[in-house]
């Protein structure tokens, strides 16, 4: 299922840009002569007939309270007939795949490899998709197959078979004693309304539930559901009189019971869940097993939204099979719908790559079940996306030259187009689009309004708007002086707050202009190009020296530059402070251990303090209170570990039907901990740790060296955590930076790929890991 992280607005300034995008014009106080001849009073405009690229069009209504932006167009783009592309598609055989020319190849090694034989076929009469492990078909390495022969037409597959979607379990009514109270009296709710009330009751103490907008939207939808199911015998009029405390207490009890489950119980539940999900996890594409992405229908609940979303708190209604459209091969067996239900529609559309689809009620948009991120379909899509971005390097200079010249065009539409292209290129803005009144007011380039931009002569611009996830974006940047003049013109009277700055263009026209230079070029491709090019430039200036931890920190700094460019912000997590404190505590513990070892050395060789005073100058750095706290933490942790081991052992004994252990059985262990505590207390008084029998100065110095390396690594980790607390590195790494750059860094700098890619990303970008080498260039 698609999850969109494409709604953020990137306005962060690129550190430095090529001089080719800077105009030589100078700022003038009087700019009336600079206004394009085409600029007149605002007239009614006609909408563009140009259709946006499929990936760029949001599945949301574009209308809002203001009049829809209408744009002058001079020509229309003809849509290529399907037949033209269909002829390019190739029929795939399920017998043997010939030895093909490698397309995603290592730049320095011109090698070709054989593709494993595909001998797996699927019977048309098969009752359901087989549930073997997907590893069976992971021998298929699409990146070693000539992509041109694979075809890039309309036909996406020849055969497709799957088991449909997994629905959430039906609602289980609350125990009879758990009630919603209204005006201090219990209310008997119908099951449908009780379920909705329970959604709010379960999150009573969260920040969302305390949000007035959330409360209002929930209450309106709750009353609507109550009305649909015949009411409850009580007239509920005011939200303030509702008491969810009994419901909240019930759900808290369930949460505590879940936490208290034994490891065996949790394991059993997990295994049952995996067994239930197994049939839906895989499908067969052209006879080859592929993993399915999110095969679950979203459960009903209250919509939270990100940032200041106007629909937060609204009810996400339960989806039934009658609302679901399945897409599969004509000869594939249609999965059985839930008992008593039927599918909304069955399609056999091999020009799309989704498996199921339905419409959700919050934004009235379509939701899809698609192939998993590590599937061949998604992998090829990612590869083509980054290859398209790479091709932009052959056109970017001419594009910049043209839009720089067009910044002074006599036509207002051209001048707006050039200014938008400048902002998209230099500051990685999204093209943007109009938002409805009931959508979060996030902004892109074409949807910038009068109030979002403040001008400070001679060439500074302040952007102040809602960016990704409705997080406020505020930044002051320097722009080309001609761009500054143009923005000043775009803001001139009669424009006022609420009016669009770019009232002669829209995202469709911007993408159309870009596609004049290169097939498939859009604002999104430009954004991907700039992100990857910036990462390449940052890697080029990193020195190949230091420890792995130091190299990872340098990599993260480069990644952070890209994230800032793309405005991938995030709010500081609630646990950030605790996490930083834990790292600081770990640093203090290592420091204490190092000082303790140095004190042992001085007990063995007291004269060393004078001979190497610098080496021992830190032995008094920790105050008594810090040392006491470290002692307490160590003892407490050891006791907790002993008790947890006792619990684990008892769980095992219980399953085997053997007598359980008691604390008396671990008395020796607890006694040793008590002895250690006494030793620490004595050490705190005397300042002299007990030296072990076999200790030597050389051995102690080796231990100190090990600790110093740990201290260095943890210090780097702490700085990295602080630097990235408000920046999301993962978004650019997953969507905008060519993964082959990261693989190149891993191999060139001898950093394990596990340090740079999570397990999920390693699976998603296996094609990059196996195809790029240390010399790869974007």
Curated annotation (Swiss-Prot):
Which residues does the annotation list for site: Interaction with DNA? 306, 354, 385, 442, 468, 511, 568, 586
Spans annotated as Interaction with DNA:
367-368, 430-435, 522-524
Classification via Gene3D superfamilies: 1.10.132.10, DNA Topoisomerase I, domain 2, Topoisomerase I, Chain A, domain 3, Yeast DNA topoisomerase - domain 1
Q: What is its EC number?
A: 5.6.2.1
Would you tell me the Gene Ontology cellular component terms? chromatin; cytosol; nucleolus
Tagged with keyword Nuclease: no
Among the GO biological process terms of this entry, one is:
rRNA transcription
Compositionally biased, Basic and acidic residues: which spans?
71-83, 100-121
Q: This protein's superkingdom?
A: Eukaryota
Q: Which catalytic residues are annotated? A: 736 (o-(3'-phospho-dna)-tyrosine intermediate)
Keywords from UniProt, A to Z, are:
DNA-binding, Isomerase, Topoisomerase
Q: Which reaction does it catalyse?
A: ATP-independent breakage of single-stranded DNA, followed by passage and rejoining
Q: Which SMART domains match?
A: TOPEUc (SM00435)
Q: Name one Pfam family in it.
A: Topo_C_assoc
* Topo IB-type catalytic domain span: 374-778
Q: Where is the composition biased (Low complexity)?
A: 17-26
Any GO MF annotation of the entry: DNA topoisomerase type I (single strand cut, ATP-independent) activity
Q: Where is the composition biased (Polar residues)?
A: 122-131
The first-level EC class reads isomerase
Q: Which family does it belong to?
A: Belongs to the type IB topoisomerase family.
Q: What is this protein called?
A: DNA topoisomerase 1
What organism does the UniProt record list as the source?
Answer: Candida albicans (Yeast)
């Amino acid at each position: 299922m698609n999850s969109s992280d494409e709604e953020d607005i990137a306005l962060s300034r690129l550190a430095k840009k090529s001089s080719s995008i800077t105009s030589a014009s100078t700022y003038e106080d009087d700019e009336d002569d600079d206004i394009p001849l085409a600029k007149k009073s605002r007239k009614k405009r006609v909408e563009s007939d140009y259709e946006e690229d499929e990936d760029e069009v949001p599945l949301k209504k574009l209308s809002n309270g203001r009049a829809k932006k209408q744009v002058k167009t001079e020509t229309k783009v003809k849509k290529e007939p399907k037949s033209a592309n269909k002829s390019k598609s190739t029929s795939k055989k399920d017998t043997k795949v010939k030895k093909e020319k490698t397309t995603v190849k290592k730049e320095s090694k011109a090698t070709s490899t054989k593709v494993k034989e595909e001998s797996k076929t699927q019977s048309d009469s098969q009752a359901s998709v087989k549930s073997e492990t997907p590893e069976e078909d992971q021998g298929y390495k699409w990146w070693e197959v000539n992509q041109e022969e694979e075809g890039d037409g309309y036909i996406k597959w020849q055969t497709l078979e799957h088991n449909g979607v997994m629905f959430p379990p039906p609602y289980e009514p609350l125990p009879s004693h758990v009630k919603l109270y209204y005006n201090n009296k219990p209310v008997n709710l119908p099951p449908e309304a009780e379920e909705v009330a329970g959604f709010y009751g379960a999150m009573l103490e969260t920040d969302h539930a305390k949000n007035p907008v959330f409360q209002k939207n929930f209450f309106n939808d709750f009353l609507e559901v109550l009305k649909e199911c015949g009411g409850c015998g009580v007239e509920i009029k005011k939200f303030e009189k509702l008491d969810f405390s009994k419901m909240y207490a019930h759900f808290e009890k369930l949460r505590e019971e879940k936490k208290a489950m034994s490891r065996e119980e949790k394991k059993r539940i997990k295994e049952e869940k995996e067994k239930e999900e197994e049939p839906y996890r895989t499908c067969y594409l052209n006879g080859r097993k592929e993993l399915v992405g999110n095969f679950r229908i979203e459960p009903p609940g209250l919509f939270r939204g990100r940032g200041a979303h106007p629909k937060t708190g609204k009810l996400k209604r339960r989806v039934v099979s009658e609302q679901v459209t399945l897409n599969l091969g004509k000869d594939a067996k249609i999965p059985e719908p839930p008992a008593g239900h039927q599918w909304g529609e069955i399609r056999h559309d091999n020009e799309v790559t989704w498996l199921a689809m339905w419409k959700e009620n919050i934004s009235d948009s379509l939701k899809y079940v698609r192939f998993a991120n590590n599937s061949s379909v998604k992998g090829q899509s990612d590869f083509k996306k980054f290859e398209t971005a790479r091709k932009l390097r052959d056109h970017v200079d001419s594009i910049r030259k043209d839009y720089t010249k067009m910044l002074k065009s006599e036509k207002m539409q051209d001048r707006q187009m050039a200014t938008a292209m400048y902002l998209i290129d230099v500051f990685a803005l999204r093209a943007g689009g109009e938002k409805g009144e009931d959508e979060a007011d996030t902004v892109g380039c074409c949807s910038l309004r009068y109030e979002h931009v403040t001008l400070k002569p001679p060439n500074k611009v302040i952007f102040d708007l809602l960016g990704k996830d409705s997080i406020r974006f505020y930044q002051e940047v320097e722009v080309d002086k001609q761009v500054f003049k143009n923005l000043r013109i775009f803001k001139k009277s009669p424009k006022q707050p609420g009016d669009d700055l770019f009232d002669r263009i829209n995202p469709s026209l911007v993408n159309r202009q870009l596609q004049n230079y290169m097939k498939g070029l859009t604002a999104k491709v430009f954004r991907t190009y700039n992100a990857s090019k910036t990462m390449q430039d940052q890697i080029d200036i990193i020195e190949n020296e230091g420890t792995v931890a130091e190299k990872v920190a340098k990599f993260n700094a480069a990644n952070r530059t890209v994230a800032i460019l793309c405005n991938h912000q995030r709010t500081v997590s609630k646990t950030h402070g605790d996490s930083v404190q834990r790292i600081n505590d770990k640093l203090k513990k290592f420091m204490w251990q190092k000082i303790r070892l140095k004190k042992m050395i001085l007990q063995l060789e007291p004269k060393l303090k004078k001979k190497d005073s610098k080496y021992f100058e830190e032995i008094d750095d920790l105050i008594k209170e810090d040392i006491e706290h470290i002692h307490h933490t160590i003892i407490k942790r050891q006791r907790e570990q002993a008790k947890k081991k006792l619990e684990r052992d008892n769980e095992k004994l219980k399953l085997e039907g053997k007598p359980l252990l008691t604390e008396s059985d671990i008395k020796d262990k607890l006694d040793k901990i008590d002895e250690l505590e006494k030793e620490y207390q004595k050490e705190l008084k005397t300042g002299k740790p007990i030296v072990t029998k076999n200790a030597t100065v050389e051995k102690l110095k080796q231990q100190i060296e090990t600790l110093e390396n740990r201290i260095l690594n943890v210090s780097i980790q702490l700085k990295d955590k602080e630097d990235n607390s408000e920046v999301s590195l993962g978004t650019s790494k997953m969507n905008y930076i060519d993964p082959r750059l990261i693989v190149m860094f891993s191999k060139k700098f001898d950093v394990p790929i596990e340090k740079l890619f999570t397990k999920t990303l390693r699976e998603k970008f296996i094609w990059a890991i196996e195809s790029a080498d240390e010399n790869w260039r974007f």
